[in-house]
Design a protein with these regions (language model features):
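Extracytoplasmic beta-strand/coil segments of soluble accessory domains associated
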Residues: 21, 53-97
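Short strand-turn segments of transmembrane beta-barrel domains in outer membranes
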Residues: 89, 128, 140-170, 178-179, ...
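Short acidic/polar hinge/loop motifs at secondary-structure boundaries
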Residues: 97-125, 143-144
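Transmembrane beta-barrel wall of Gram-negative outer-membrane proteins
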Residues: 158-183, 188-225, 246-271, 369, ...
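Membrane-embedded beta-barrel scaffold of Gram-negative outer-membrane proteins
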Residues: 167-171, 271-286, 433, 439-445, ...
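Structural signature of Gram-negative outer-membrane beta-barrels, strongest in the C-terminal barrel
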Residues: 312-320, 352-496, 528-530, 540-543, ...
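Gram-negative outer-membrane beta-barrel transporters
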Residues: 314, 368-375, 383, 488-498, ...
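C-terminal beta-signal and adjacent terminal beta-strands/loops
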Residues: 590-597, 615-665
């Protein structure tokens, strides 16, 4: 609430001195020589997101494309990337620890983080390979666990389509528990999900040291609805509830245990060591592919991340050991042409294990130039080794070793083998303070991602060996941060070039000869015209294009815009503190037009949505919230693409309302 000039001044100060963890330790945002955005707990609670897409509207340059249920695809200074290893372009973490192990990502893995009860979510746009290593290619999204402190409250929420959610928070000086459960009946026919998340924490500190232990558990049981097909069918309300794949489902569980040790070494610096273990298990029906095979994937890991911050230097060592498995089994005969029926038979398609080892070291060095300028240079060297073991006959055969007609089965199992990748990332940045309220920064950075295990060992057609190498990206960025008595500004201009882009070509081979270019501007502006009104704008202008003609298409596509890459997107929030009890917010979200195919022949026109939120604090001793989403009842698509000769859409939901009440304990 902003009911007084003192509170107003405090908010200005808080926004201009946000504390972040871009370098693994807390520091003022004014010390960061690059872009970073932080969504704080207050914003997260006000948004009350039912899907991570709703919350990330508050970050310029980020689009989390909403699928069905809790599914999503990610874009951070990039198109929405699809394919077996597309998720490897982003480092998604909780408390700095990657949600999934190197080589074992999943495009939907953000639902394995407790974003609904986070103290903050931080986003770094562009490569951040020195600190985070492989997968920090297009960006980093880090979910921070809530602060351990005395607190107690329970929240109940009710909404459209039989939506029910309950949250419980209880904590003391050393312990804290955050848990929530959700049941969503689903807008689409025969869809919906049940989801539970739990975060348990223990924090103990002494004069110079601290120990912080966190346990995360997530469980998702989802009845998944598929794309609806047909040009502009998302505009037909008679079809938007239809579900062509009522048989589809996804079950996913995850556990992560971390222990962070911090030692304040005084004049010698600070030592940080975090040990962790992770376990993930997922089963889902591939309803989007011919044959609809069942995929089962799981992996478990142990590892540590460490850094020593001393004087002008930061030195770190990270290591991870992971064991992963993947199996694909088709229960029924494929429906379709004689070719599909013959080449995609029922039975086991893949069954393999991968033992992975990652070790990396990095160094950051800071040099103060004069009184107002800071130069930072850094480098990271990372080694990734995969030992792959195949448990089925090698090649394009059925599980019993017999060959398929038409030259062999679609799937191709490579022989057991080992692969290793050595990558180096660098950064050089400059931060200059013009005044206490205005600073400029510039940086030249690089990033990489090792191939995902599915890109190497889940082969198709006549490809028996995948000789792909790591993707790499180079970025140049210039930015400005400033604030005044009634405004805040954070904007950056960037240009990136990506080489060795990995994709599946028209012959169904995994290859790595793609080249793409990415450029744009991201801006965030906050304006406080008086003590009761706040206006916040997050906006991105971007252009993503193919820089060569990879075999994604039979056409020349160099210079074409990459599909699912809107040229503009963003959001505007107008918040009004009506009185000490009541607040209101009107939100406009914009998604510009984008092409649905590499040939740029099919286009989605984009859409604009309005959302309304009302809050009552302390009314009858409780806190109340009302959200009305898609106030104008716009007909739109959350995602549009063109595949198998058809337009396909994940349909946006019509106007809907959610009511919540929070009761203190």
């Amino acid at each position: 609430m902003l009911a007084s000039s003192a509170a107003f001044a405090e908010r200005i100060t808080a926004l201009s001195e946000i504390v972040v963890t871009a370098s693994r330790i807390q520091e003022s945002i004014s010390s960061v020589s690059g872009n970073i955005t932080r969504i704080n707990q207050e914003t997260r609670e006000q948004v009350g997101h039912t899907h991570i897409n709703e919350l990330m509207q508050r970050v310029a340059g980020v689009w989390i494309s909403r699928g069905n249920g809790q599914e999503h695809l990610t874009a951070i200074r990039s198109p929405v990337l699809t394919g077996a290893g597309a998720c490897g372009a982003f480092l998604l973490a909780q408390d700095g620890i990657p949600i999934r192990a190197n080589g074992f990502c999943n495009v939907n893995e953000l639902f394995e983080a407790n974003t609904e009860q986070a103290s903050a979510i931080e986003v770094i746009r562009g490569p951040s390979g020195v600190t985070y290593g492989s997968n920090a290619l297009h960006g980093v999204l880090n979910v921070l666990s809530p602060e351990v402190k005395p607190v107690g409250k329970v929240t109940f929420e009710f909404g459209a389509n039989d939506y029910l959610r309950s949250k419980l928070i209880y904590g003391g000086e050393r312990y804290r528990a955050d848990m929530h459960g959700t049941r969503d009946g689903g807008y689409k026919d025969e869809s919906g999900f049940d989801q539970q998340k739990l975060t348990l924490q223990r924090h103990v500190s002494a004069e110079q040291t601290s120990h912080h232990t966190v346990l995360h558990y997530t469980n998702l049981n989802q009845e998944t609805a598929g794309f609806i097909r047909g040009a502009n069918i998302y505009r037909d309300r008679g079809q938007t509830r239809s579900n062509p794949n009522p048989e589809a489902f996804r079950d996913a569980r995850s556990i992560r245990l971390t222990h962070r040790y911090t030692n304040d070494l005084g004049a010698s610096g600070e030592l940080l060591v975090t040990g962790y273990g992770r376990w993930s298990d997922m089963v889902f029906l591939q309803h989007f592919l011919p044959g609809q095979a069942l995929e089962e994937n799981r992996h478990h890991s142990i590892g540590f991340m460490s850094s020593l911050h001393t004087g002008a230097f930061v030195v770190g060592l990270d290591a991870d050991i992971t064991q992963g498995q993947l199996a694909e089994t088709q229960a029924r005969t494929t429906v379709g042409s004689p070719f599909l029926v013959a080449t995609i038979p029922a039975g086991q398609h893949y069954d393999y294990d991968v033992d992975a080892r990652t070790i990396a070291g990095f160094l950051d060095w800071e040099l103060i130039l004069g009184t107002n300028t800071l130069l930072t240079a850094g480098s990271r060297v990372e080694s990734v080794i995969y030992d792959y073991t195949n448990h089925l006959p090698v090649g394009r055969t059925r599980a019993d070793g017999t060959r398929c007609d038409f030259g062999g089965c679609r799937f191709n199992r490579p022989a057991s083998r080992s692969d290793d990748f050595l990558n180096v990332s660098t950064k050089l940045s400059l931060l200059h303070d013009v005044s206490a309220a205005l600073q400029f920064f510039g940086q030249v950075t690089s990033g990489f991602r090792a191939p995902q295990t599915t890109e190497l060992y889940r082969l198709q057609a006549d490809q028996s060996v995948s000789n792909i190498d790591s993707e790499s990206i180079r970025s140049v960025e210039f930015g400005v941060r400033g604030f005044g008595q009634r405004w805040l500004l954070d904007a950056s201009l960037y240009k990136m070039t990506k080489d060795n882009f990995i994709f599946r070509d028209t012959n169904r081979r995994n290859v790595d000869n793609g080249e793409t270019r990415h450029q744009g501007i991201d801006a965030s502006v906050h304006w406080f015209p008086n003590q009761t009104i706040t206006a916040s704008l997050q906006w991105s202008l971007a252009h993503h294009e193919y820089d060569n003609t990879p075999a994604l298409s039979g056409s020349e596509i160099r210079g074409n815009e990459i599909d699912t890459a809107p040229g503009s997107f963003g959001s505007l929030q107008l918040a009004w503190t009506i009185n000490p009890t009541w607040d209101a917010e009107l939100e406009w979200t914009h998604l510009g037009s984008y092409y649905q195919d590499p040939e740029n022949n099919h286009e989605y026109p984009g859409h604009d949505l309005l959302n309304l939120r009302l809050f009552a604090q302390g009314l009858l001793g409780w806190d109340w919230g009302l959200r009305i989403m898609n106030v104008a009842d716009e007909k739109y698509a959350e995602r549009a693409d063109f595949a198998f000769g058809e337009d396909r859409y994940f349909v946006g939901e019509p106007r809907r309302a959610f009511l919540s009440v929070t009761i203190p304990l």
